[in-house]
Regions:
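12-transmembrane solute porter fold
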Residues: 1-145, 188-194, 198-201, 208-210
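A membrane-interface helix-boundary motif in multi-pass transporters
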Residues: 23, 143-195
Length: 211
C-alpha cells in the first residue's frame, strides 16, 4: 500500500503541475478529496472490520486501491483532473482502511509489553514502502519517459525538459508535446504495474489471511 501511495502520489503530483500546468496550490487542492478519504476511513476502519470481518476489510481495501490505481490509466495529456480526483479518492478509501488495520493487527498480535516495538516496526515498514515506491515506480516511469524521446533531446526529468523547451521559443512546442506524452506513458506504466501487484496481494490475502 505504501509503495503505491508513495510512488503514484509523486508521479500524479508531477502530472498535475507539469502536464496539466496547474500551480502548486491548485494541485494540492485537487488532492484534498483523497486526503479526506484516507483520514475518514482510517478512523472508521475498525467499524468496517467489525461489520465485514478483518480479512474482508483488508481484501476490499486492497481492491479499492487497485481500482484507484487503474483509474490513473484514464488520465490524459490534455485533461484528467476530475478523473484524477475520483480515482484517487477511491484509492484513498482503501489506503485509509489498510493503514489503520495494519497497525491494529501488528500491535494486537504481540504481548502488551512489546506493543511499542511492534508499532515502531510497523511505522518503519510504512516508511520503507514509501521509499521503495518512489524508487521503483519513479525509476520505471523515468525509463519509459526517456524511451519515448524518439531521438529528441529529453532531459532527465519532465520539468528539466520543459525548461529546456522554454528556451527554444516556438520550436520548443513539439518538444513540450512529446515530453508530456512520454511522461504520461511512463505514469500509465507505473500505474499498471501497481495495479497488477495490488491485485496479486488481494488474491493472496483472500486465501491466506484468517477471517
Amino acid at each position: 500500500g505504501m509503495m503505491a501511495l508513495g510512488g503514484m502520489s509523486y508521479l500524479t503530483g508531477v502530472y498535475l503541475q507539469s502536464v496539466l500546468d496547474m500551480d502548486v496550490l491548485a494541485a494540492a487542492i485537487a488532492g484534498l478529496p483523497m486526503a479526506c478519504a484516507v483520514a475518514i476511513f482510517s478512523v472508521g476502519a475498525a467499524k468496517v472490520a467489525a461489520a465485514v470481518g478483518t480479512r474482508n476489510a483488508f481484501v476490499g481495501s486492497v481492491v479499492l486501491t487497485a481500482v484507484g490505481m487503474a483509474g490513473v490509466l484514464t488520465l490524459g495529456v490534455d485533461d484528467g483532473l476530475w478523473m484524477y480526483m475520483l480515482f484517487t479518492t477511491i484509492a484513498g478509501i482503501g489506503f485509509g482502511v489498510q493503514f489503520s488495520l495494519v497497525s491494529e493487527v501488528v500491535v494486537g498480535s504481540v504481548p502488551p509489553e512489546r506493543s511499542g516495538a511492534a508499532s515502531s516496526i510497523s511505522e518503519t515498514c510504512f516508511e520503507l514502502g514509501t521509499a521503495l515506491g518512489l524508487g521503483l515506480l519513479g525509476s520505471l516511469a523515468t525509463l519509459v519517459f526517456r524511451g519515448g524521446s524518439d531521438g529528441r533531446e529529453f532531459s532527465d526529468t519532465l520539468g528539466d525538459t520543459l525548461r529546456t523547451a522554454d528556451g527554444l521559443g516556438a520550436s520548443g512546442d513539439a518538444l513540450v508535446a512529446a515530453a508530456k506524452v512520454a511522461f504520461v506513458d511512463g505514469m500509465h506504466t507505473a500505474a499498471l504495474a501497481t495495479t497488477a501487484l495490488l491485485t496479486v496481494v488481494a488474491v493472496v490475502l483472500a486465501f491466506v489471511m484468517r477471517p
